[in-house]
From Swiss-Prot:
Keywords: Chloroplast, Membrane, Photosynthesis, Photosystem I, Plastid, Thylakoid, Transmembrane, Transmembrane helix. The gene is psaJ. PANTHER family: PHOTOSYSTEM I REACTION CENTER SUBUNIT IX, PTHR36082. Its main location: plastid. May help in the organization of the PsaE and PsaF subunits. It comes from the Eukaryota. This is Photosystem I reaction center subunit IX.
Length: 44
C-alpha cells in the first residue's frame, strides 16, 4: 500500500514536469519558426 501511495504522489509531479517541458519546447519552436508546416531543417 505504501508503494501505491508513493507511485500516486510521484506520477503527477513527473507528468507535470514532462508536459511543461514539452509545452516550452513547442513554444520555442513556434517562436523560431512561426506558422511553419514544414520545418526548414527537415527539407534536404
Amino acid at each position: 500500500m505504501r508503494d501505491l501511495k508513493t507511485y500516486l504522489s510521484v506520477a503527477p509531479v513527473v507528468s507535470t514536469i514532462w508536459f511543461g517541458a514539452l509545452a516550452g519546447l513547442l513554444i520555442e519552436i513556434n517562436r523560431l519558426f512561426p506558422d511553419a508546416l514544414v520545418f526548414p531543417f527537415f527539407s534536404f
